[in-house]
């Protein structure tokens, strides 16, 4: 069995951790060997938080090298573009179309790059770009954007039954937030 990899990118504090916990739980429930690692790039000052998730029959390291990731899940377009060098040719990017302006844009020193989705596609990526923030808000809370993205990611794992994702939400999310997260997952999956 080949090792599959996912690189998850985030600008929303805490979201990557929950999303990677859900993904890790799902993969473990399917008897994969799973390795997870987080890299914090001064997120409190506008840097990325990246979680690497690798899985397969046997995985020795969570680190994903450039050109090796099968998928990137990004909470913001510029973050997806920043990490595209880690995606293998023909890899999948699932990206929230939200634009979070980095400090150089906020201060007027730079402009937010345009046409990011088409540039990622031109670089050889398969891009699934949707307004997952609006999807999360439709579910009941913008904070559920991570689960909406996980719902969409689940479509790219046809070998993993949908109930495994639902069970992961039940196992990890506090009971009072489960209904909201299940709704966000379903809306994201079917977006």
Residue ranges and their predicted role:
Residues 1-191:
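Active-site cofactor/cluster-binding pocket
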């Amino acid at each position: 069995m080949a090792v599959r990899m996912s690189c998850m990118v985030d600008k929303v504090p805490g979201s990557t951790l929950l999303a990677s916990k859900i993904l890790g739980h799902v993969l473990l429930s399917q008897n994969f060997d799973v390795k997870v690692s987080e890299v914090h790039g001064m997120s409190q000052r506008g840097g990325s938080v990246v979680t690497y998730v690798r899985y397969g029959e046997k995985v020795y390291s969570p680190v994903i090298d450039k050109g090796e990731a099968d998928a990137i899940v990004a909470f913001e377009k510029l973050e997806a573009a920043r990490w595209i060098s880690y995606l293998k040719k023909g890899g999948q990017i699932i990206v929230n179309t939200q634009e979070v302006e980095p400090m150089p844009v906020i201060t007027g020193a730079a402009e937010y790059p345009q046409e990011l989705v088409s540039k990622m596609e031109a670089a050889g990526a398969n891009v699934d770009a949707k307004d997952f923030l609006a999807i999360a808000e439709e579910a009941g809370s913008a904070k559920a954007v991570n689960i909406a993205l996980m719902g969409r990611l689940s479509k790219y794992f046809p070998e993993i039954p949908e109930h495994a994702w639902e069970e992961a939400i039940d196992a990890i999310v506090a009971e009072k937030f489960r209904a909201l997260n299940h709704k966000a997952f379903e809306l994201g999956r079917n977006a």
